[in-house]
Amino acid sequence: MRGRDEDTGEFRGASRSQQRREALEIFDLGEKLVALTPAQLAKLPVPESLIPHIEESKRITSHIAHKRQLAFLAKHMRREDDETLDAIRDALDANSDTARREVAAIHRVERWRERLLAEGDVALAELLEAYPAADRQQLRQLVRNAIHERAKNKPPRAYRELFQVLRDLSQKPGLESGDAGLEDEESASENDE
């Protein structure tokens, strides 16, 4: 199908530069697949014919041999149809969006923890407004202990425990007002910056 059209004299198919760009995109996709854990890989719509090549690429550690194996994997991936490769790309993008949301949730919890340590009862009142089911006494005790540990240069056990309690609190299902409170906190901190 490639070559010149006999009637018009124009080239058919993609240019060599376009073919090179597509090959590099597939090579990069192969690198991303090799970097995934087996559990993450199982969630993706990867054809069974590619799994052994991906596993072999993971096994090889020598730099040049690993690169050669990735090129071999890319060669097999180019044989797959575009719909399959697009489905893999879409699934990888969805996974990265999920990971980004999880990281954002952790950052929100960290901001709450820092606010509790810096502002004390003012931040605690806002947190309890957002999460009415939260245990005020436990949170206040953890904040006090974390401040005390920081002042005495002790290991941050209460600091970590406060994070765990806040994370568990933010992950409880059915706390719609709590989620709104965290979102309000996130947007307020972004507006301050």
UniProtKB/Swiss-Prot annotation:
Pfam family, one: DarP
Positions of region (Disordered): 1-20, 170-193
Biased composition (Basic and acidic residues): 1-10
Source organism, top-level taxon: Bacteria
GO molecular function terms attached to this record: ribosome binding; rRNA binding
Record localization: Cytoplasm
Principal place of residence: cytoplasm
Keywords: Cytoplasm, Ribosome biogenesis, RNA-binding, rRNA-binding
InterPro entries: DarP (IPR006839), DarP_sf (IPR023153)
Keyword NADP: no
Record's compositionally biased regions (Acidic residues): 181-193
GO process annotations (BP): assembly of large subunit precursor of preribosome
GO CC field: cytosol
Cited function: Member of a network of 50S ribosomal subunit biogenesis factors which assembles along the 30S-50S interface, preventing incorrect 23S rRNA structures from forming. Promotes peptidyl transferase center (PTC) maturation.
Family: Belongs to the DarP family.
Annotated protein name in UniProt: Dual-action ribosomal maturation protein DarP
Species per Swiss-Prot/TrEMBL record: Xanthomonas campestris pv. campestris (strain ATCC 33913 / DSM 3586 / NCPPB 528 / LMG 568 / P 25)
Lineage, uppermost ranks: Bacteria, Pseudomonadati, Pseudomonadota, Gammaproteobacteria, Lysobacterales
